[in-house]
Amino acid sequence: MTTQRHYSPIDRLLLQADMAMRTLLPFSGQPYRPSPAIVQPDAQMSETETRHVAGLMRINHTGEVCAQALYQGQALTAKLPQVRAAMEHAAEEEIDHLAWCEQRIRQLGSHPSVLNPLFYGLSFGIGAAAGLISDKVSLGFVAATEHQVCKHLDEHLEQLPAEDEKSRAILEQMRIDEEHHAESALDAGGFRFPAPVRFGMSLLAKVMTKSTYRI
């Protein structure tokens, strides 16, 4: 017979602090799955192409930082235990993406964005606020966010040099996972956000992508 552990508010705050450090500190996120890039050949790219791919992967890495913070914030304030558990499980899956992107960025001779702590804090606050409103809104926010991420991944896949199979393999697997997260959130009862809200979210996403491409 299995028992479910019940965490106190202090326990949850400590867990959130631990997850924040694992998300933001270099090389601290250990993936549960090996990177899809491992089995792909190295690419011969020009310096300009390498810088561009590094910028794209930096954007994707920051996107995963935001997703991690969003899930953690929602898990902290979710009202139903099953919703909280779903958020925590999704956050664990995002650790893979976080680690894969960082590994690829380092391979390309670059670094994650210095703005990650800022975006983590903002996303955590948004996630916690959504959870306070209702679990339905919280799940809907997950779905809308993941659909936005899928659009960015599609755009980045089109921009990758044809020979960069390592980055392509990572983004393709991330695309599959993010779509699954979005559909799972809707299936669990998530609210489908109207077009104006999704448009506002896309504007905020553009701020993140423009700023993290270079820094």
Curated annotation (Swiss-Prot):
The residues that hold Fe cation 1 are 64, 94, 97, 178
Residues binding Fe cation 2: 94, 146, 178, 181
- Cell compartments where the protein resides: Cell membrane
Topology term for the membrane: Peripheral membrane protein
What UniProt keywords apply to this chain's record, in alphabetical order?
Cell membrane, Iron, Membrane, Metal-binding, Monooxygenase, Oxidoreductase, Ubiquinone biosynthesis
- Specify whether Metal-binding is a keyword of the entry: yes
| GO annotation terms (biological process) | ubiquinone biosynthetic process
Give me the reactions it catalyses: a 5-methoxy-2-methyl-3-(all-trans-polyprenyl)benzene-1,4-diol + AH2 + O2 = a 3-demethylubiquinol + A + H2O
Per its record, what are the GO molecular function terms? 3-demethoxyubiquinol 3-hydroxylase activity; metal ion binding
On cofactor binding, the record's note says: Binds 2 iron ions per subunit.
Q: Which InterPro entries match?
A: COQ7_proteobact, Ferritin-like, Ferritin-like_SF, Ubq_synth_Coq7
GO cellular component annotations of the record: plasma membrane
Q: Does the keyword Cell cycle apply?
A: no
List, alphabetically, the PANTHER family matched: 5-DEMETHOXYUBIQUINONE HYDROXYLASE, MITOCHONDRIAL, COENZYME Q10 BIOSYNTHESIS PROTEIN 7
Its function, per the record, reads: Catalyzes the hydroxylation of 2-nonaprenyl-3-methyl-6-methoxy-1,4-benzoquinol during ubiquinone biosynthesis.
State the name under which the record lists this protein: 3-demethoxyubiquinol 3-hydroxylase
